[in-house]
């Protein structure tokens, strides 16, 4: 990515995923079962997509080898949590390579060590069993992750509330809408802060719109 591209996508770090979701009418949010391993995990970056067969992660290693710094590895493991797509060894290599984070529609393992990496990891679950490496899988292809279609280069944004996807080409429009939603939310919160009358007026307006 160019410095201009990095500066642009960095703006999404200051906006909650809830506001980005609202800007996209909630249509591109991954299933709520895909959660951050650490509550403070946050990830923003273009998707480097991976499609794997159940219990096989060689394609993940290929994607890491080809990834550019700042990419988010997004893995369609079809929700299978019987075998881990990655553990602390693979995740540690990804961090060293400058990969921005992992989003896995499946499981990881080595939880304590993985948490200690301070590397953004979003996954459906955890398990003990390792994956095989038979080579079955595809990289940089359209996938479905967490019930949402994702194409290579789509912008991935994740925080404590979950993960959402901004389709490539819509980033600027979504950024402006999300910024406005964030500003409106903050103004509304300031207006009612410790103000019983303002709260009652707001509730009245919502319950009995004119």
Curated annotation (Swiss-Prot):
Its cofactor is a divalent metal cation. Gene3D superfamilies: Ribonuclease E inhibitor RraA/RraA-like. InterPro entries: RraA/RraA-like (IPR005493), RraA/RraA-like_sf (IPR036704). Keywords: Lyase, Metal-binding. SUPFAM superfamilies: RraA-like. The keyword Transport does not apply. It catalyses: 4-hydroxy-4-methyl-2-oxoglutarate = 2 pyruvate; oxaloacetate + H(+) = pyruvate + CO2. Catalyzes the aldol cleavage of 4-hydroxy-4-methyl-2-oxoglutarate (HMG) into 2 molecules of pyruvate. Also contains a secondary oxaloacetate (OAA) decarboxylase activity due to the common pyruvate enolate transition state formed following C-C bond cleavage in the retro-aldol and decarboxylation reactions. This is Putative 4-hydroxy-4-methyl-2-oxoglutarate aldolase.
């Amino acid at each position: 990515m160019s410095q201009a591209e990095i500066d642009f996508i960095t703006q999404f770090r200051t906006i909650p995923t809830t506001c980005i979701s609202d800007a996209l009418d909630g249509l591109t949010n991954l299933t709520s079962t895909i959660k951050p391993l650490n509550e403070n995990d946050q990830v923003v970056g273009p998707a480097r997509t991976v499609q794997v067969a159940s219990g096989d992660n060689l394609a993940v290693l290929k994607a890491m080898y080809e990834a550019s710094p700042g990419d988010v590895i997004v893995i369609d493991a079809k929700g299978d949590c019987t075998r881990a797509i990655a553990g602390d060894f693979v995740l540690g290599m990804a961090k060293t390579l400058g990969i921005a984070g992992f989003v896995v529609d499946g499981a990881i393992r080595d939880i304590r060590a993985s948490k200690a990496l301070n590397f953004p990891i979003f996954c459906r679950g955890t398990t003990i069993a390792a994956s095989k490496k038979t080579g079955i899988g595809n990289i940089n292809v359209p996938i479905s992750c967490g019930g949402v279609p994702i194409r290579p280069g789509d912008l991935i944004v994740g925080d404590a509330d979950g993960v959402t996807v901004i389709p490539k080409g819509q980033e600027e429009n979504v950024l402006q809408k999300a910024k406005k939603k964030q500003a409106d939310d903050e103004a509304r919160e300031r207006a009612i802060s410790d103000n019983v009358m303002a709260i009652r007026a707001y509730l009245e307006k919502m319950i009995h719109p004119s």
